[in-house]
Amino acid sequence: MAEVSPMMQHYLQTKEQYKDCILFYRLGDFYEMFFDDAIMVSKELELTLTGKNCGLEERAPMCGVPFHAADSYINRLVSNGHKVAICEQMEDPKQAKGIVKREVIRVVTPGTNTDMASLDEAKNNYIMSIVYTEDKYGIATCDVTTGDFFTTEVDTERKLLDEVSRFNPSEIICNEAFYMSGIDVDDMKNRLSITVSALDSWYFSDGLANETLLSHFHVQTINALGLEDYESGVIAAGALLKYLYETQMNSLDNILELHPYSIGKYMIIDSSSRRNLELVETLREKQKRGSLLWVLDKTRTAMGARLLRTYVEQPLIEKSEIIKRQKLIEALNANEITRDEIREYLNPIYDLERLITRITYQSANPRDLIAFRDSLKMLPPIKQQLSDIPCELTDEINEEFDELKDIYELLLSSIEDEPPISQRDGDIIKAGYNEEVDRLRDAKTKGKTWLAELEAGEREKTGIKNLRIKYNKVFGYYLEVTNSFKDMVPDYYVRKQTLTNAERYITPELKELEDTILGAEDRLTSLEYELFRDVRKQISCNVSRIQKTARAIAQIDVFASLALVASQNNYCKPKINESGIIDIKNGRHPVVEKMITNDMFIENDTYLDQHKNRISIITGPNMAGKSTYMRQTALIVLMAQIGSFVPAQTANIGIVDRIFTRVGASDDLASGQSTFMVEMNEVANILRNATAKSLLILDEIGRGTSTFDGLSIAWAVVEHISNPKLLGAKTLFATHYHELTELEGKLDSVNNYCIAVKEKGDDIVFLRKIVKGGADRSYGIQVAKLAGLPDSVIERAKEIAEQLLANDITDTVKSISVDTGHKHKKEHLDEVDMTQISLFDTVKDDDIINELRSIDIGNMTPLDALNKLYQLQNKVKNRW
C-alpha cells in the first residue's frame, strides 16, 4: 500500500483528537471534509461527494465548502446537533516550507455558537453543565454570547427538569453519574431538542473546578465568589468553564462574573405550568405569537427582548423589588413624550452584548465596529432623557449606565464610515488617524496618476490609440492591445498572454512602476489590518463597562415596553400584598383579548384568600370559558409579580411563591403513559411541591378514568388542598363533576362558581361570565350540536341522557354526612382536624376476581394493560 500523504497524516492526527466533531480542514479557499465526515455532511448539506488521492489504495471520500461561506454551513450542522472543529491554515501557503501549518482554532457546538446571524436575537443561547453528586444536582448555565454565567444546586429530579425547562439550553454537558441518577436523559434530549454529552470524569473533579474558577476570576478563594454553600454548583461551573476554554480557545474575557442563585429567589413555575400558561410560546404551534411574551414584548433592542423573556420566566417574590419596577413603569407613563423619545433612541441600537463578545473574541469585522459606534451615539440622549424620570430604579440604572464617550470617539476617528466587511481588504482606517497610512495612501493615489501618464505616453509613442493599462491578480499590471493594432507593437514590449481579440504585454518601466504601487498597497493593507486589530483590542479592554451599559439599556428597553403595553391596553397598577389575598376586579386574559377580533372580551372578577375563600370550584359547559378564566387569573398574578401592570380595572395581588397548573389532556406515548397517568403524575407533583402560598390552577381532574374513580379522586384532591394542615393553597378548580359543588358548606374554604349560559330552546349562548353558585348541567349535548354532530346522533344522545338521569348519583352525594373517620386511618391524618367524606360503597374481592377472569390479555396493548392494572389497583385500595 502506498504511503499516506503528509497532509492526510496531519488530517488523521487532528481528527483523532476531535473524534466527536466534524472536522472542517482548510485547504486553500475551501474547508474540506474526508471519510465518514464527508459522507455524512454531503448528505445533510446536499453537497457533491467526491474523492481525493491521499496515498491510500482508494480515493478518500471528500466534500467541501468555500471558506468565505463556511459560517452558513457550520450553522446548519450545529443546529442539527453536531459539533464542528475548525482547522485553519496558520500561514500563507505560498510562503510555507513543506506542509502548511494548520491548527484547530475553535470548536463550534450548539451551546457555543457565537454567529449572530444564526442565533435568535430575542433568546439567550445557553449551554448547561450538570453534575450529579450524592443525591444532589449541581447546575451551571452560561450564554457565551452575552457573558451571563449562573450556578445553583437542586435536590430532586423535578427541580432539575424545571431548571432545564426554564433555561432551555441548546447543549448540556454532564458527568457519567448523571445518566445513572434516574433522569431519562434520552427522553429529555428528544423532548427539548438538546444535545447532551457526558464528559470524562476529570472534568468534574472539585480540584480542577476550584483551580479553573479561581484562575479565571482572579480570586484567592471560592468564598470570594459567594460559592461557599454551592459545592456541587462549583463543580458544575468549573467543568463548564473548562469546556468553554477548550472549545473557544480564547481567554473568555466577556465572562466577568459567576452568579450563584437559589431557586427560591423567584416564583417557581414548573415545566408543565410554563407550557400550559404559554408564557413564551404557544402549546401547539411553538410560536411566540399567542403567548404572554408576544403581548408584552414591544422592546426595541435584542438585549431588551432577552431580558423581558427572563423577567417573564422569573417573576419576583420580593414585594419591594416588584414595587420598584412598578414605580418606573408608572413614571414612564406619566411622561409619555419622554417614554416615546427614549424608545426612538433605542431603535437604532444594535446588540451590544453580543457585539462586545465578538470584539473580545477577535472575530468582529469592520462593519461590526461601525454598528457598535452607531449604537454608542444613542447613549448620551438616552441618559439625558432618563433624568426626566426620577425614581429609585432609574437611579440604580444610571449607576451602571456609562455613555462610553471615549470608545465612541476612538471609533469615530479610526474606522471609515462604510468599510468593507473583511478586515484584510483595506480601506478600513480613516484619514488622519495614522500618519503612515496617510503616506502610503498618497503613494497609492500618485501611483494611479503615474499609470495614467505612462498609458498616455505609450499611446503617443506607439500610435496605438486604444492601448490600455489594466490589472488582475494573476499578471499584475499589463498593457492590452487589440489585434487590429498588434503590428504596431514595439520590440521592447514583452508578450504575457494572447487572447482571442487582443494581446497583453509588459515593459520594464511598467514592471518597475508595478513594484512601487503594489508594494505600497500591500504595506497599506497590512498596516490597516494591524491598526484595526489594535482598535478592537482597545475596545475589548473595556468589556466590563460595556456589559454594564448594555444591561442598563436592556432594563430601560424592558420598562419602556411594559409601560407602552400598559398604556395601550388600559392596564392597571396592581397593589401588592403579603397577606395572600388575590382580588381582581374586571380582569381580562391578556392574550385572548388581543386575539379575538369580532367579540368584546368579557371581564370577570376573582377573589381568593387564605381563609374562607381558598378554593373556587368552577362548573359549566365546555367552551364556556372556564379554562380561559383560570389561566387569566394565573397570568394576572404572574404579570403583577414581574412588576408589570395588569389587564383589570383594579387588582390587589398577594404574592405567591409558586404557580402550578394542571390543564389539558394528552397521552405521553413516548414513555407509554396514558392521558390519565400523565394527569395523575402532574397532580401528584402539585400536591407534593405546592405550599400554602402557592396558586393552583386545576382543570378537569379525574376525567381520564371512569366517572366514579374520577369523581373520587377529584373529591379527595379538593379535601387535601382545603386542609391548611396538609396544604391550604389558593385554588381554582374547574370540573364537570357537579357533585363536587356539595363540598361548599362541608368544607369551610370552598366556594362554588359557574359560567353563566342563556338557553334558547335547545340551544345555548355562552355568556362567559363567572357567577356565584354551581351549574346543575354540563350542556354537553348542546355543545355537541354546536360542533355539528348529525341530528340523529344528537336526538339519540338526548334519549340516553334521560335514561341515565334516573341513575344520577347527585342525590346520594347530597345525603352524605360527615364520617367520623376510617377504621384504618393513615397516621399522618390523625393530626388533621377534618374528617374524610365517603362517596361509594367499598369494593368486594369477588368483583375484582371476576374482572380479572374476564380480561382478554391476548388482545390488549401494553398501554391498555397498564391502565387496567391501575384501575384494579385503585379498586383494591377501595376495599379499605
Name each model-derived stretch.
Residues 361, 365, 375-378, 431-432, ...:
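Charged, surface-exposed helical/loop "interaction arms" that form contiguous linear patches used
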Residues 204-212, 216-219, 267-268, 283, ...:
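Amphipathic heptad-repeat alpha-helical coiled-coil/stalk segments that mediate oligomerization
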Residues 87, 110-119, 251, 390-393, ...:
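Active-site phosphate-binding and catalytic loops of NTP-dependent enzymes
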